[in-house]
Regions:
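Acidic, serine/threonine-rich low-complexity disordered tracts
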Residues: 2-113, 158-256
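Surface-exposed beta-loop interaction hotspot
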Residues: 105-168
Length: 256
């Protein structure tokens, strides 16, 4: 009996993912604090050979009570949420740690918080979940892939989005909270930020009465290359905050 052909020898190193890393600076636009640094975020996005992608982010808000958040959020090859981890401290004290898992017809959460203790949640979904808000600024731009760019100026609605916290700073929980989302595509623009100059897409998150406190209008710019990398954000109203990509490092396989 003939011997089976030997399997081809694979190289010892396997580097078939592509990665990008960056820093988002948080500043104030209030007149009495104009351009004062009020926080920062360090993120990394890895896209694997099978098309799945994961964002890890460390987020810091210095405004009292300070917020520190660490997240790990993954999508499948079709940009559908699969799972997320969120750990949260407020005022330098532990608030909660939670793990979220998304199925085709329900979402679940296992969390431990300083207020509620150990909590298990299950939330039914009418359709598979399209997007999840974990409050990392880098991930805000990932919602925008759902918006039709052939309808500029029109309010478009994402019927269901789950949050890890309904608080504007994401400073509660983490636990599941369901809302819809209203977004306008403003249009393509050329944009220069601290990290460089980009072909960008401009969107605006508009009024949403489903939150316990209505969020002010939020403008977001992201890359126009299909990766939806966050470039800049501006929140109006009582918040008057600014978010800007100031550092960007692409791995060797990411592309230009």
């Amino acid at each position: 009996m003939a011997n089976a052909p030997a399997e081809p020898k694979l190289p010892i190193l396997q580097r078939d993912h592509r990665s990008v890393m960056g820093k988002v600076l948080y500043t104030s636009k209030k007149p009495e604090r104009l351009n004062q640094e009020r926080g920062r975020e360090y993120f990394r996005i890895d896209v694997h050979a099978d098309g799945t992608r994961t964002c890890t982010a460390h987020c810091e808000i210095d405004d009292r009570p300070s917020v520190m958040r660490d997240i790990t959020y993954s999508l499948d090859a079709h940009w559908m949420p699969t799972d997320c981890f969120v750990r949260l401290s407020v005022g330098s004290k532990f608030i909660g740690s939670g793990w979220f898992l998304f199925h085709s017809d329900f979402a679940e959460c296992e969390t431990l918080t300083s207020l509620e203790g150990r909590v298990s949640q299950r939330m039914d979904l009418a359709t598979p979940l399209l997007t999840f808000q974990n409050h990392a600024i880098a991930c805000d731009a990932w919602h925008l892939r759902l918006i039709d760019q052939k309808k500029p100026g029109e309010v478009q609605r994402i019927k269901q989005m789950l949050l890890s916290s309904p608080d504007h700073r994401g400073a509660t929980g983490p636990m599941l909270f369901s809302i819809g989302l209203n977004i306008v595509f403003v249009g393509p623009e050329k944009l220069t930020v601290g990290a460089g100059s980009f072909d960008a897409l401009h969107f605006q998150f508009v009024a949403n009465s489903e939150l316990p406190q209505e969020h002010p209008p939020y403008d977001v710019w992201c890359t126009a290359d299909g990766e939806y990398l966050f470039l800049k954000g501006q929140v109006a109203g009582y918040m008057q905050t600014h978010y800007e990509l100031v550092e960007l490092s692409r791995g060797p396989h990411w592309g230009n």
